[in-house]
From Swiss-Prot:
InterPro entries: aa-tRNA-synth_I_cd-bd, aa-tRNA-synth_I_codon-bd_sub2, aa-tRNA-synth_I_CS, aa_tRNA-synth_I_cd-bd_sf, Glu-tRNA-ligase_bac/mito, Glu-tRNA-synth_I_codon-bd_sub1, Glu/Gln-tRNA-synth, Glu/Gln-tRNA-synth_Ib_cat-dom. ATP binds at K239. One of its GO terms (cellular component) is cytosol. Zn(2+) binds at C103, C105, C125, D127. Keywords: Aminoacyl-tRNA synthetase, ATP-binding, Cytoplasm, Ligase, Metal-binding, Nucleotide-binding, Protein biosynthesis, Zinc. The keyword Protein biosynthesis applies. This is Glutamate--tRNA ligase. PANTHER family: GLUTAMATE--TRNA LIGASE, GLUTAMATE--TRNA LIGASE, MITOCHONDRIAL-RELATED. The gene is gltX.
């Protein structure tokens, strides 16, 4: 992986949400640095002032921290905008050495000459000797012949004939460097040895490799372009169409360990048949050479299943701690004083075995802490038929007398159901809806035990009154 100390960088732009693709690239970079005993640099490419916002930079740092890439464990964040003078100096050097020239061609003028402004620049200003001035961008003088060969750990050695690479812009008319140049200057001066990034940047690589050479680098960095991430229709993930914001998964209750494990599978696989593996195993076995170049399918259903498995592997105490943010405002719809930690703890193991994301805990246990059962109208209409009113009355009378314990409550309802010609499954339906508000949920009798006799009896009576009109 090259000689000397390995230095990688993760260079996101603070122009919106933190994409799951960016999270994967960050993890790949982090692991390469960790395995090599090298350095991870966070460089925030904030040169697009019209689109950047400080809160998005904060969001990047927070998201990385959630993934285990914590401040203090890396260099940065370095704001690319703080290095604007270095970028300008590099542009001036390219011009002074005859490796770049000024151009005043507009898109319209190019279209007139070529018939198509999308065909690329035709080199019209190459030998005009223009000086810097308003409306004049600086273009790199691409070699007329030869081939630029990119050695990529994932994609082999793609070749780019130089004649197909247009004289590309490296600095705008105001002197500010464009992404291509700023990126190379920063990588070169920061001593970056490995550039690990998304496949969409591969087309930029021959241009950047030419700039590395022009700016005096002995060799380009080690390139590694990780595969594009696609949805179920094999379309590239889009923030306009797909659920791609890492923050949305975090806020929904995905565990960072599950997310990290799943993201690592987007182009790579751990040894053996198991995909759910300890992070220590991933950290000790990950190698860029094993990353596949083919598109990686982001399967939300699989991620959710992963998360559910990670939740089930927690201890009950860890699970209770993990769901704590959802058991209080603003996530919880009940008053803070209504929360009963003992009642929740009694049902926590049952809930843990059923949730796939932590936020699912709220509708699973809200009946415990709300003053009234959160009745689902469709569930009510389906369950409260036939002898429901009489059954609820009989259950109420029996439950007022017997021991308040799940098995006893079950036996009691079984007995009442038989009197009404109902098997236990049918007899449970109106009781469940009356007490919990829903037709499905945690095991009924454990739920009743946790809810308590007084509240259960009150809700059974209220449900019967609603059915009978008084």
């Amino acid at each position: 992986m090259g000689s000397g100390r390995v230095r990688v960088r993760f260079a996101p732009s603070p122009t919106g949400i933190f994409h799951v693709g960016g999270a994967r690239s960050a993890l790949f970079n982090w692991l390469v640095a960790r395995r090599a005993g090298g350095d991870f640099v966070l460089r925030v490419e904030d040169t697009d002032a019209s689109r950047n916002r400080p809160e998005w930079t904060d969001g990047i740092i927070s998201a990385l921290d959630w993934l285990g890439i914590s401040p203090g464990g890396y260099e940065g964040p370095v704001l690319q905008s703080s290095r604007a003078d270095r970028h300008r100096a590099a542009a001036e050097r390219l011009h002074a050495e005859g490796l770049a020239y000024y151009c005043d061609c507009t898109r319209e003028a190019l279209a007139e000459r070529t018939g198509n402004a999308q065909r690329g620049y035709d080199g019209f200003c190459r030998d005009r000797g223009l000086a810097p001035g308003p409306g004049r961008a600086l273009r790199f003088r691409t070699p007329d012949d030869g081939v630029t060969i990119v050695e990529d750990l994932i994609r082999g050695t793609p070749e780019f004939p130089n004649e197909t690479i247009e004289d590309f812009v490296v600095a705008r008319a105001d002197g500010s460097a464009v992404f291509l140049l700023a990126n190379v200057v920063d990588d070169l001066e920061m001593g970056i040895t490995h550039v690990i990034r998304g496949e969409e940047h591969l087309s930029n690589t021959p241009k950047q490799q030419l700039l590395w050479a022009a700016l005096g680098a002995d060799a380009p960095p080690v390139w590694a372009h990780v595969p594009v991430i696609v949805n179920e229709k094999r379309q590239k993930l889009s923030k306009r169409r797909d659920k791609v914001a890492l923050e949305s998964y975090r806020d929904e209750g995905y565990l960072p360990a599950a997310m990290k494990n799943y993201l690592m599978l987007l182009g790579w696989a751990p040894p053996g048949e198991d995909e759910i593996v300890p992070w220590e195993t991933i950290e000790s076995t990950f190698d860029l050479a094993d990353v596949k170049p083919s598109p990686a399918f982001f399967d939300e259903k699989k991620l959710k299943a992963f998360n559910g498995e990670y939740i089930r592997r927690l201890s009950v105490a860890e699970f209770i701690e993990a769901v704590r943010p959802w058991l209080s405002a603003p996530a919880a719809p009940w008053e803070p004083a209504a929360f009963d930690a003992d009642a929740f703890a009694a049902l926590a193991p049952l809930a843990q075995s059923r949730v796939s994301v932590l936020s699912e805990i709220v509708p699973m246990v809200d009946f415990l802490f709300l003053p009234e059962a959160p009745i689902d109208d469709a569930a009510w209409a389906k369950a409260m038929k036939g002898p429901a009113a009489e059954l609820l009355a009989d259950v109420h009378d029996l439950y007022d007398k017997i021991e308040w314990e799940a098995e006893t409550l079950k036996a009691g309802l079984t007995e009442v159901g038989e009197r009404h010609g109902l098997k236990l499954g049918k007899a449970q339906a109106p009781v469940r809806v009356a007490v919990t508000g829903r037709s499905v949920g945690l095991p009924l009798f454990e739920s009743l035990e946790a809810l308590g006799r007084e509240t259960t009896l009150r809700r059974l009576a209220e449900a019967r009154e609603r059915l009978t009109g008084g």
